[in-house]
Amino acid sequence: MSSHLRKKLVIVGIGGASCSGKTLLAKHIRNALPAGATIIHQDDLCHPEEKVPYSSRYPDLQDWDDPDTCIEWPKFRSLLHEIRQSGNLPSHASHDHLNKEVKVEVKAGVFERWKVELEKLSKEQTGQGVELVWFIVDGFVLYYDDVLRSRREERQVYVLQPGGVWVDPPQYFDKIVWPGYLKAHDHVFDGVETGPLKEEWSRRLILLTPDEGEEGMTTAFDKSCEAIVEGCRNGAGSFIPTTS
């Protein structure tokens, strides 16, 4: 049956500062989707350690978080282009499964409610001759607070490509990570540290500032799924070109 359906690509972007819970949220959403989803982690597109530049302000520290150089941008753009053209993820190495992850669950009732709603959405689209193909991209954005700093300091060891290990030096979050976030998102907010989204971005993004723990993750999951379903019913996504 699916061979007669037009494939429609839906890419869900989840931004968050380092250790803000974006990857965990992405996995909860993936698990609720009836056909699952492919998750793309921007962390997998970081440069090899030997190509990471040193900070101009702190020349003894490598700067993994400057938005201009934090990932291989041409490779990332090429990967997204291929996904839009084929609906398939090009081969690339991922090390997400090797990184330490603190599990924070979504309340079962909320998860099941959205699982049913997403299944309903899928059937609606099938009835219209459309098969939804899901991708989730998680990358570094969101607000900063002391909890993010403590999480980064607790998770100081990062697995790198192709198999190396990076350990955060002292005060790395304050000197490198947070300034990189500010630089990357100054154009998105009216006052990047405490201000709201700029008007042109408020029409395109959903800003989430949930609490800690299961309650906060449940809120983030709930709001995200609501936005996803509403967006799809309003025509979000793009059709994947067919080949003859």
Locations of regions flagged by a protein language model:
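Conserved lysine of the Walker
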Residues: K22
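A glycine- and Lys/Arg-enriched "phosphate-lid" helix/loop adjacent to the NTP-binding pocket
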Residues: P59-D63, W134, D146-V188
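Post-Walker A alpha-helix
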Residues: L25-A26, R30
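NTP-dependent small-molecule kinase module
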Residues: S2-L5, K175-S244
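Extreme N-terminal, non-catalytic leader segments
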Residues: M1-G13, A35-A37
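Conserved nucleotide-sensing/catalytic segment adjacent to the nucleotide-binding pocket
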Residues: T38, H47-V110, K115, D174
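The conserved Walker
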Residues: S18
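ATP-dependent NMP and nucleoside kinases share a basic, alpha-helical "lid"
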Residues: E112-P162
